[in-house]
């Protein structure tokens, strides 16, 4: 399964990073960071309308290289100027061609919150996200225990961050809710085989109480898709490949927000 492979390579990368910089040193780096003055992500999600999380992504396990020309800073700035509410940055290198320095540079250059899009399996990675400018992390229910879901979210909040707790099945939505998640992501992509079912998020939306913001992820391609998700009561959409392949990124974000 692809997800198992992703977790395996993440463990190897984590061990390498821990050898390069200890957790104690990383905590010191985080402690010295200036206060974040970007808009609060959770507060923004609770405002009316459908919010857009625009993703900076060069490749994926299912599609391989999505774009060969990858001016990541220019892309992120275009998202920001187009009115994206947050920017997701892939930092997983082996399957997504991501890198932490993309996150750090983008976080320094945009006015909106940034999300570290990676496979968080250890508290070290949360401190690492913070040190590189992220104010949002992703917690994937399928790869974490109930205790980890709760502990990692609470650590993120202690550091002034938010966590999107991502689910794919009804059982995972239940676990996300039981963990105390304050933002839930419903993925249309099965991370075990990377197949996409757009209707997955529509089917599971009703499980989440209206007081908890919900993000629809993956397989969102058209304005009709966006309208369906808005009508279903989603608070936000995360769009990656569709934006990355578009030559009119600003116009596409503006159109999605307008039609929603």
Swiss-Prot record:
GO annotation terms (biological process): L-tryptophan biosynthetic process
A Pfam family of the record is: IGPS
Q: Which domain of life is it from?
A: Bacteria
Record keywords, A-Z: Amino-acid biosynthesis, Aromatic amino acid biosynthesis, Decarboxylase, Lyase, Tryptophan biosynthesis
Under Enzyme Commission nomenclature, its number is 4.1.1.48
A molecular function (GO) term: phosphoribosylanthranilate isomerase activity
What is the uppermost EC class here? lyase
Cite the annotated pathway: Amino-acid biosynthesis; L-tryptophan biosynthesis; L-tryptophan from chorismate: step 4/5
Q: Which residues form the signal peptide?
A: none
The UniProt record lists the keyword Amino-acid biosynthesis: yes
Question: Could you confirm whether the keyword Ion transport appears in this record?
Answer: no
Catalysed reaction(s)? 1-(2-carboxyphenylamino)-1-deoxy-D-ribulose 5-phosphate + H(+) = (1S,2R)-1-C-(indol-3-yl)glycerol 3-phosphate + CO2 + H2O
Family note:
Belongs to the TrpC family.
Q: What is this protein called?
A: Indole-3-glycerol phosphate synthase
